[in-house]
Structures are given as structure tokens and as C-alpha cells.
């Protein structure tokens, strides 16, 4: 195991003022540990469909390492994480210890061998990319997967598929202003299309409410102690409180339009046909 516990490793952007730091790292400063748009339940469902035990797993941009801990607990054959941020990489290395390998690198150019992984996992990172970068990262995931391997993603979605384009543009602008990241969430149809354009076959799709700052979600994901920690940190720090409230107002304004969405797709064998996808029960994750 690492000599340093995760709490002793600085958060990414820790030297940047709260007023200008990316929203997800602001929430991490507040003490939030589950930063995925659909919550821990949607992540758990995604990992279950990815079939981790005995697999060689690669995780792209693992962030705080919360999902990394769940992956290594599932007893994969191997675990490799790729993160461009040295502080994030250090935190994940502290989480997985000798149960995995963490490398600093780019999600679109991992440096890994062709067909070296059974599963590639990525959460809440494609949303932050433009169209070309999204496609490049998905292509890289497809490259490192073995035939039959699974690509599992958990991202921010918008609904419905035929959302008004002008309204969608305003949603994106307001979201970018609130979180200080040029986030580009997509419809379920667009997320499916992104994976299919890389030659992958979508097997499973599920959604959950985007309730990142709702008390019920925090109690479920963080536990009573974690939720209390977040509330205390926010209440005692004026700048932190202002940023969190700004994000909360935007999330509330668009709560009917945004969802957490998870998909699992596989890389087909050469010459294999496609199979119909499996949708989650009534399109939502249990307990989300």
C-alpha cells in the first residue's frame, strides 16, 4: 500500500481559488466523495454489467479513486488507471496500493498495448470533452479492448432525445458558467451513437436522476456522517458556499432535463453481428 493515505494527498486544483476552480473539484473540497451524476447506485449497476471479476481492467480519469476502490474489491485480474493530473494519480495510487498500477497519461493516448484489456471504465469525463476529444477517447478505449471486451461509461445526459436545440444550447451555457468547465452532456441517442461510431455494440443503458446536490442522494451516497461533513464545510466557508449554491441553482433549474446515464458496450469479434441492447428497468437505476 502507499505510504500516504488519500487524505494526505492534495486535491487537484487545490491552489486555485474556489471561485474559479472546476465544479467537481470544488465539491471534492467540500468533502463530497461520490461525484458521478447518477450516483453510486448507477455506478454499481454499470460495474455489475461490465463483469469485473477475473478481468484485466483499465480505468480512465479515475478522479478521487472511489470507483477504483470498488473495482479492485471485485477481484479483477489486473487494474490499471490512467489520469493526466499528477495529484489525482497520486490519490488513486494511495487508494489501490499494490492491487493496481496508476500511470499519468492522456485518456486519448494511454500508451497501452493494443487489445490488452477486458474492461475499460470511464466516468464523468467524456462529458467534459468536445466532440473530437470524445471520439478520440472512445476510439482509444476500443483500441485497448480485446474482442469481446466491455467499455463502461457513466456520464451526464440530457432528455428527451428530441430536446429543443435552442434550449439545449442554453442549458449547456448555464451549466458551463456554473461549474466552470465547458461540459457537453448529450442525449441517450447521442451517447449510443458515439460508442457505435467507434465500432462498439451497446449492450446495456440505464439512467438515474442527476441529483448530485440533493440531500437524499448525499445521505445515500455519502452516509449520514459524510453528508454532515459536507454541510459543515459548506456552511463555514463563504466562498465555498457561494459556489455550491450557484451550482445547485443551475442543477435545480434543469433537473427535469439532465440525467446520469450509464452504458456498457462490447467490442465485437471479427465478423460478429450486433445484438439488441438491454435497457434498465423503466430506464432508471434502482435506488437512484
Residue ranges of each PLM-predicted region?
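Class I SAM-dependent methyltransferase Rossmann-like catalytic core
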Residues: 16, 21-40
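Conserved Class I S-adenosyl-L-methionine
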Residues: 204-288
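Conserved catalytic/acceptor-binding region of the Class I
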Residues: 148-210
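A short acidic, Gly/Pro-enriched loop at the edge of an enzyme's catalytic core
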Residues: 108-120
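Conserved alpha-helix/loop element of class I SAM-dependent methyltransferases that forms part
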Residues: 36-53
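A short glycine-rich, Lys/Arg-flanked "PGG" loop and its adjoining helix->strand segment in the class I
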Residues: 135-150
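Class I SAM-dependent methyltransferase SAM/SAH-binding core
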Residues: 64-109
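Conserved class I S-adenosyl-L-methionine
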Residues: 54-63
Amino acid at each position: 500500500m502507499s505510504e500516504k493515505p488519500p487524505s494526505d494527498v492534495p486535491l487537484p486544483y487545490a491552489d486555485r481559488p474556489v471561485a474559479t476552480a472546476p465544479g467537481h473539484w470544488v465539491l471534492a473540497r467540500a468533502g463530497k466523495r461520490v461525484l458521478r451524476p447518477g450516483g453510486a447506485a448507477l455506478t454499481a449497476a454499470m460495474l455489475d454489467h461490465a463483469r469485473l471479476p477475473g478481468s484485466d481492467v483499465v480505468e480512465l480519469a479515475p478522479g478521487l479513486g472511489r470507483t477504483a476502490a470498488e473495482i479492485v474489491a471485485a477481484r479483477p485480474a489486473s487494474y490499471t488507471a490512467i489520469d493526466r493530473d499528477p495529484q489525482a494519480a497520486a490519490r488513486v495510487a494511495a487508494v489501490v496500493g499494490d492491487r493496481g498500477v496508476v500511470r499519468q497519461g492522456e485518456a486519448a493516448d494511454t500508451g497501452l498495448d493494443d487489445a490488452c484489456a477486458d474492461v475499460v471504465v470511464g466516468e464523468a469525463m467524456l462529458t467534459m470533452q468536445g466532440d473530437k476529444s470524445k471520439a478520440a477517447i472512445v476510439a482509444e478505449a476500443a483500441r485497448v479492448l480485446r474482442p469481446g471486451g466491455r467499455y463502461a461509461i457513466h456520464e451526464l445526459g440530457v432528455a428527451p432525445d428530441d430536446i429543443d436545440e435552442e434550449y439545449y444550447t442554453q442549458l449547456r451555457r448555464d451549466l458551463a458558467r456554473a461549474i466552470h468547465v465547458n461540459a457537453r452532456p448529450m442525449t441517450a441517442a447521442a451517447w449510443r451513437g458515439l460508442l457505435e461510431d467507434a465500432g462498439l455494440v451497446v449492450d446495456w443503458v440505464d439512467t438515474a436522476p442527476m441529483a448530485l446536490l440533493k440531500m437524499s442522494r448525499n445521505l445515500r451516497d455519502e452516509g449520514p456522517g459524510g453528508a454532515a461533513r459536507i454541510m459543515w464545510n459548506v456552511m463555514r466557508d463563504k466562498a465555498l458556499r457561494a459556489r455550491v449554491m450557484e451550482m445547485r441553482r443551475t442543477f435545480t433549474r434543469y433537473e427535469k432535463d439532465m440525467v446520469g446515464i450509464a452504458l456498457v458496450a462490447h467490442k465485437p469479434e471479427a465478423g460478429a453481428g450486433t445484438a439488441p441492447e438491454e435497457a434498465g428497468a423503466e430506464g432508471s437505476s434502482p435506488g437512484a
